[in-house]
A protein has these predicted regions:
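Nucleic-acid endonuclease domains
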Residues: 1-301
């Protein structure tokens, strides 16, 4: 059975529990595992609190792999305060592997607020986004270590994901499919016969001849390349032999894949340059442009 087969099975299982949700949005899988471990009710939508505890109070989740730390992405113009409204506390969960929690801490919201306020007072950055880092030492000093039920290995959703993870390791060398974009990347690579490049600072995939490729994906027909600057944009595009735009019909079904020549993509990008230095720059091309300027290499029958 293929990686895609197990991912589709996981999607069906998640839909039975959370209809109309997309279980492959960033953070969903880990938050699902954490909510089950704590006996919380997960909010399957991206907006609002992450979950509700046994007292029906809103809580926020931050998850990270062992050796890393909790991160909080703040848009400076809007401030951090709005993210703390309606939340009683934050739970930090350390994962020892893709689907296994090793430790959970609870930190009260007043301590989170104080830390964020102090962090923001020290930064000189006035626009764009900033990451507030919560190091494990700070979490240990300010949080309470929580006993938890266990992990969600018995759920059909996680069981199917675990099967997909085994294939990801064996065939693509990917040790954690919960990372942002990984599932879609592997599904595309499976269609095109490519290998995955696991280093996030490099291209997304390569072929047997060493040619590199960038993968852009969309459900709505908008294909976005993120974090563009004058220093990196040409290298991010021109290092690739091709850019592939994969249109997803559902979160687990690719309807079409189009191949774009990097030089054509650069010509389109020229209309947006030079890139401003005071904000995060994302470059988007739409499905109509892709179809007019690309070559179709896969179409769902």
């Amino acid at each position: 059975m293929t990686f895609g087969f197990h991912i589709k099975s996981a999607y069906i299982s998640a839909q039975e529990q959370f209809p109309e949700s997309n279980p492959f949005l960033p953070g969903f899988i880990r938050e699902y595992i954490l909510a089950n471990a704590l006996g919380h009710k997960l909010n399957p939508q991206k907006k609002g609190v992450d979950a509700w505890d046994n007292l029906n109070q809103g809580v926020e989740y931050k998850t990270f792999k062992s050796g890393k730390w909790g991160r909080f992405n703040v848009e400076i113009q809007h401030g951090y305060e709005k993210h703390l409204v309606g939340v009683s506390c934050w739970y930090f969960a350390e994962f020892s592997s893709a689907f296994t929690i090793s430790r959970i801490w609870r930190v009260e919201i007043d301590k989170i607020s104080q830390y964020c306020k102090a962090f923001m007072s020290r930064t000189s950055k006035k626009t764009g986004h900033i990451m507030i880092d919560f190091r494990v030492k700070w979490i240990q000093e300010n949080g309470i270590l929580i006993d938890f039920i266990g992990n969600s290995s018995s759920s059909d959703f996680i069981r199917h994901l675990s099967n997909a993870q085994e294939i990801a390791i064996e065939q693509f060398g990917v040790s954690d499919i919960t990372l942002k974009g990984r599932i879609r990347e592997i599904m595309i690579a499976e269609k095109l016969g490519h290998s995955i490049i696991v280093n996030s600072k490099k291209a997304d995939a390569n072929d047997e001849f060493g040619n590199q490729f960038e993968y852009l994906t969309s459900l709505q027909g908008n294909f976005q390349m993120t974090h563009m600057t004058e220093d990196n944009s040409e290298a991010k595009v021109l290092r690739n032999k091709s850019i592939y735009c994969a249109q997803f019909e559902t979160p687990v079904s690719i309807s079409e894949i189009w191949e774009i020549e990097p030089k054509i993509y650069m010509q389109k990008m020229a209309t947006r340059r030079p890139w401003p230095t005071d904000r995060q720059n994302n470059f988007t091309v739409r499905i109509n442009w892709v179809r007019e300027n690309g070559r179709c290499v896969y179409k769902l029958e």
